[in-house]
Amino acid sequence: MAQDRKKVLVLGAGYAGLQTITKLQKQISADEAEVTLINKNDYHYEATWLHEASAGTISYEDLLYPVESVVNKDKVNFVKAEVTKIDRNAKKVETDAGIFDFDILVVSLGFESETFGIKGMKDYAFQIENVLTARKLSRHIEDKFANYASSKQKDDKDLAIIVGGAGFTGVEFLGELTDRIPELCNKYGVEQSKVKITCVEAAPKMLPMFSDELVNHAVNYLENKGVEFKIGTPIVAANEKGFVVKVNDEEQQLEANTVVWAAGVRGSKLMEESFEGVKRGRIVTKQDLTIEGYDDIFVIGDCSAFIPAGEERPLPTTAQIATQQGEHTAKNVKNILEGQPTNEFEYVDRGTVCSLGAHDGVGVVYGRDIQGKKAAFMKKVIDTRAVFKLGGIGLAFKKGKF
């Protein structure tokens, strides 16, 4: 009977949430459950491509596609709304478009930028966070070149860019920048030698997930393209002039008219308001990706702190993990609907590739180090596969990297 259908509610159409939906809609009939997907935008965007749109090497439109283009409307009700409250005990979710009841809840609300309380960071630095921030940043970079070219009183700081963070996002953004800068210089008649790109990293090593050989390749490649690295140099503040850094216990002002923060992400702030034991927007889940005390609430993606059995630290927040969690959660939701026990999540690490612009990269694929053009090719394969897994061959052909 239709009135006996369980209500399955999925919050967020990022990698984890949309993967849950696209897999679940293939596994159940419309009579088995009333499935609702809530997302604040009517589009999904490829978050792992944000560094490209932020640098301007691709358009922001290349990042996104309509959620409804991959949703089976006969089985899934899509609602464009912003979630404002999760009441786990009353089994209700409040949004700006009304209140939704649930029997099974999947929380996959995605990430936000984490500034670690650094003074002025939110006010003065660009973030690599979503489609809107990407549009603003790429436009700002070009505006500064245009301003420099048209001004009688040249301000060299218009051609200075400082990036905070030499982790994955920071390095990939730097790679795209080194592709974009020659285009901008050519367009606006600017001498490329006048452009100054600086990367500041507090940790003693950049890209800590990779071997020294791969890190050295990335550093050499980017330095040859004009990037200056300041490693082991914490940023203590951001202001209207740029970043304030600490060097040998002394503060120094680094000046630029474009400063970018790419050194941290956290789960949605709604997590702290809705659940206990949340740190930086992430909650520790059980092995089946539900949370303690609530066998009908799954938390996946950037809001999930999943610690594999026998280990001490949670897995990092990556699209690969989020996608696998989404696939697994779809199966577990199906199990619950059929009165079957849930299964434990087992992550399969297929590797990681960090792009250095369109033609180079470093990475580890199935335990083997790769670099150069081979890594760049693998990155395109990974990006295209991610689109294929959500939208099939048609979407992969339209939005993929080949």
Swiss-Prot record:
Q: Which residues form the active site?
A: E172
Q: What class of enzyme is it?
A: oxidoreductase
Return the EC number: 1.6.5.9
Catalysed reactions listed for this entry: a quinone + NADH + H(+) = a quinol + NAD(+)
The cofactor remark states: Binds 1 FAD per subunit.
Intracellular or extracellular location(s): Cell membrane
One of the entry's Gene Ontology molecular-function terms is:
NADH:ubiquinone reductase (non-electrogenic) activity
Q: Which UniProt keywords apply?
A: Cell membrane, FAD, Flavoprotein, Membrane, NAD, Oxidoreductase
Claim: Nucleotide-binding is one of the keywords in the record: no
Cofactor names from the entry are: FAD
GO terms for cellular component:
plasma membrane
Q: Which residues make up the binding site for FAD?
A: G12, A13, G14, Y15, A16, N39, K40, V83, D302, A319, Q320, K379
What biological-process terms (Gene Ontology) are attached? Answer: aerobic electron transport chain
Family classification: Belongs to the NADH dehydrogenase family.
Q: What does this protein do?
A: Alternative, nonproton pumping NADH:quinone oxidoreductase that delivers electrons to the respiratory chain by oxidation of NADH and reduction of quinones, and contributes to the regeneration of NAD(+).
Q: What is this protein called?
A: Type II NADH:quinone oxidoreductase
Instruction: Look up and give the organism this protein is from.
Output: Staphylococcus saprophyticus subsp. saprophyticus (strain ATCC 15305 / DSM 20229 / NCIMB 8711 / NCTC 7292 / S-41)
